[in-house]
Amino acid sequence: MEGSSRDLVEKFVSKKLSQNEACRKFSNNPNPMPYLMEPSTSERPGEGATQGIVEEEVLQALLEATEEFELRYQRAFSDLTSQLHITQDTAQQSFQQVMGELFRDGTNWGRIVAFFSFGRALCVESANKEMTDLLPRIVQWMVNYLEHTLQPWMQENGGWEAFVGLYGKNAAAQSRESQERFGRLLTIVMLTGVFALVCYMRRR
């Protein structure tokens, strides 16, 4: 998955936004964010097909895990999207504050799922407010944070292959009966006047 973080984030956000009415209205294309879906230039000769299969497995596992996460904490996410008060000037600050709180005391796969869910929520809120020019910027913030902050931990803990092993093939849905498998608590707090998402996950 080296060099494919942007592809993964773009496809994840695009898939999520395709379910959102506010975003679909901006384009008749089934893909609501065609300007984000640029072909990757990171593939080595002969690796495209294999890498594509791996990326699809990661994307599917990530979609299932975030869907389960958002379903589990539906009320919290509803409150979050209605109270974020996102503007062109405050979006990046809100993103940075939430990330600082989310990973303040460490990283685990559950918090990485929460990271993607929050990025999606931020994109949906921006689309709802017709600030679609924010979408590629949010994607870039996610890519930067993923590559520069989260990847060292991920590489030390088995990489995306380990994530697929934990959350792939509908494992997230099967974990509904086990609180330890998908986390302990989602809380929402005020941070310097900005409504932020804080998720404390128990290590698997």
UniProtKB/Swiss-Prot annotation:
Instruction: List localization entries.
Output: Membrane
Specify the protein's topology with respect to the membrane: Single-pass membrane protein
Which GO molecular function terms does the record list? Answer: BH domain binding; channel activity
GO aspect biological process, one term: positive regulation of apoptotic process
Q: Which domain of life is it from?
A: Eukaryota
Find motif (BH1) and give its ranges: 101-120
Spell out the Pfam families in the cross-references: Bcl-2
Q: Which GO terms describe its cellular component?
A: mitochondrial outer membrane
Q: Where is this motif: BH2?
A: 152-167
Transmembrane ranges, per UniProt, are 181-198
Q: Which UniProt keywords apply?
A: Apoptosis, Membrane, Transmembrane, Transmembrane helix
Tell me, in a sentence or two, what this protein's role is.
Confers strong protection against cell death.
Instruction: Please state which protein family the record places this protein in.
Output: Belongs to the Bcl-2 family.
Name assigned to this protein: Apoptosis regulator R11
Organism per entry: Xenopus laevis
* Lineage start: Eukaryota, Metazoa, Chordata, Craniata, Vertebrata
